[in-house]
Structure formats: C-alpha cells, structure tokens
C-alpha cells in the first residue's frame, strides 16, 4: 500500500482534516476481490457527480458534469481529479464551504466494475480509451472513458485549465437489448 500512499499525496495536500470530515486515507481498506465503483452527487460550487473506480489501492476519480447518462448518444465531460482513498467510497456529508470541494456529498450509485478488452486498465487509461462494465444499483452495462484530444495534433490531449489534469468523455456504450432508449435515472 506504499504506492497508494504516494498516490494520495495531492489529495491530502488539498485538505485540512481538522476542518473536513472527509477520510484522510489513514484507515486501511483492503482492496476488494472485485473492483468497486462509487458515484457521489457533489453539490459544490458547481453541481457535478464524482465518478470513482477502484484501481491499485485508490479510487481513480473524475468530476462528471451533468452526471452520467445511460443514453449512448449523450457524452459527458469528465474532468480527471486527484486519486481518492478507498474509504471515500463510504463518505457522505458536508464539506465546509471554506474547504476544497466545499458542499454536500451524497451517495448516488455504487457497485462493482470490470475492464473490457485486451488491455489492462492501466494501459487503457494511458492510451486514453478505457472500456469497462458497471454493475451498480442504478448504472449497469458497458461504458467508455475517452481522453479528449485538442486541435494541436493527433497526439495532443486537453488539460483542464484549473486542475491541469486530463479531460475525458464518459458515455454509455450500448442501448438496451430490446432496442428501446434507456430512461435517465432520477437525480
């Protein structure tokens, strides 16, 4: 778990744990036999949904504008944010407005996920084309995160202007088997 501790350096640097009830990551949470995911509705300065996938002892995390959509035609901006500790998967509460991410965090969905395709999750993320399956309470099925390219050439990708982290597109990969359009989950 030494690697996970190093991955949480940015997360810890942004927070004052004497003021926020967010988990510091000090509590040991063993990796699950099957990888977990959580989606938390986060009413911060801008309402968004925090999308987290367990990988290598941390939650890889993205802030998703408008929340995930089950309609494959809907593409959602997903700004990569710092890795979060695994105990964040149980966090709900209010972060003080004066703190980073100030606002209310509510559990929106949780479950298990598995990678799709021949690449490891690490290689797929590095390549900028990461396919996976979710088995959650609200979201089920095949999804993809694609790193957004900018107009500076085929190998360039966009960074978020504030976080300097990658911008991605999150979308569902398929309609339902009966061909009907999926309905959007209630917010």
Give a label for each model feature.
Residues 1-187:
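A charge-rich, low-complexity, intrinsically flexible signal that marks solvent-exposed coils, linkers
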